[in-house]
Amino acid sequence: MNKIYRLKFSKRLNALVAVSELARGCDHSTEKGSEKPARMKVRHLALKPLSAILLSLGVTSIPQSVLASGLQGMDVVHGTATMQVDGNKTIIRNSVDAIINWKQFNIDQNEMVQFLQENNNSAVFNRVTSNQISQLKGILDSNGQVFLINPNGITIGKDAIINTNGFTASTLDISNENIKARNFTLEQTKDKALAEIVNHGLITVGKDGSVNLIGGKVKNEGVISVNGGSISLLAGQKITISDIINPTITYSVAAPENEAINLGDIFAKGGNINVRAATIRNQGKLSADSVSKDKSGNIVLSAKEGEAEISGVISAQNQQAKGGKLMITGDKVTLKTGAVIDLSGKEGGETYLGGDERGEGKNGIQLAKKTTLEKGSTINVSGKEKGGRAIVWGDIALIDGNINAQGSGDIAKTGGFVETSGHYLSIDSNAIVKTKEWLLDPNDVTIEAETHSRQAKSIDEELPNGDGALNNPKKNGESVTTLTNKTISEFLKNAKSVNITAKRKITVNSSINIGANSNLTLWSEGQSNGGVEINDDITSTGGNLTIYSGG
């Protein structure tokens, strides 16, 4: 959902500022023929620094008792901070890592608050100590990093503009001692209700800066944009960020109600996007596209306790180099109908859905109980020169969507690698896989003639209670068919390789044809008296067949 912003002339600033498309405009002329304000689609918006505007106004210092109505009860508890006010424009000059407690930290729609700091790496920590939520509806500007901590909740309005060198908003609290030590451990305040952060506005930061929205629940409906930096949506009860500039995140405690939702647009040009929560829902756009030969984007979505449900678009393209990297994990991972993952590039990127290669769980990666690619979903790791890698794992893995890991020209030379694996695996006849090499690695494999398509079922229905439940998952009430002979024969038409491995048994109940220069491997470890059972013809028109049965 792209937000459309336009330029609006501000009489009090005597300048153009970016505002929501819903805001009322102000013409430069009152004549009927005056041109309408220009419109632009926000991608990586670089706002004009507001410091030059404010300093030119010649503001003077006044007592904080007459401070603009949104900010109240300023108390500097560490470092120094001074304030200048002119009507609805407030400038605060602070020392490095200053800590300021507030009774209220709001910015009204007609207000502007600016923190002038010693350098770009300087930070100011603002904490609300009352029971009021923070509502940011106006402009927040700084040459440094701004932290806003409010355990009651934070809402960023649809007309709000945040333009800093780094921005962190959190409903999880942090002690003054941890701030001073630069130990960014944030925790849910004891006995406090679950608090939410919601962004409806525009958040931009300087090059290589970071935006972090941290809370019991986190929701983005607006636009967040960084260039080469990082954007994190983190929902939990205890979270540690070891480096706020290049976040390394330790996700300590989560509960089912800790949810992260993106309905808006998030752009981290050539940077990193982290979404971590108990459950995750994306219906907007997550983009870490790059045009750099030296750097590609990286996206991580981790639903620690529940489902990662993906609609919309996730993109980390790079047409100058290798596409980016994407990892989506959770108890359950679902790529919904119409969802698009695009990691294409000069060389295709890498994506991991539900786990890693063969479900080994290396480096502590979470393995999904169920991973679904719904019909009409797309994974694209294709490359102009070489295809990339797509790994899909689930204890139950249902593949009804499309996976493209093609290179250019001869796919036998430039194609990539696709793995669709799980203890129980079903490849629907609707699925289209384009790659050089395709690995399937379930417990058992059955190749049948095409019947009807799969219908989505819950985990309980896939693994019903009763005798042999885990060994007898269902497909529309029938035994699982791993894939159809049509799917495998179509794939093997032109110089491609399919490696089907099974821990127990491989059963071929319908005919297969292997095309010229293609390779089919049927490999059974032979556990539980398994092996390879062939009940129909396997023919070849210049291809190769390898059969191995262990046990």
Residue ranges and their predicted role:
Residues R6-F9:
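Active-site and channel-lining beta-strand-loop segments
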Residues R12:
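IQ-motif-like calmodulin-binding regions
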Residues N2-I4, A15, R24, H28-S51, ...:
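Extracellular and secretory-pathway beta-repeat/beta-biased strand scaffolds
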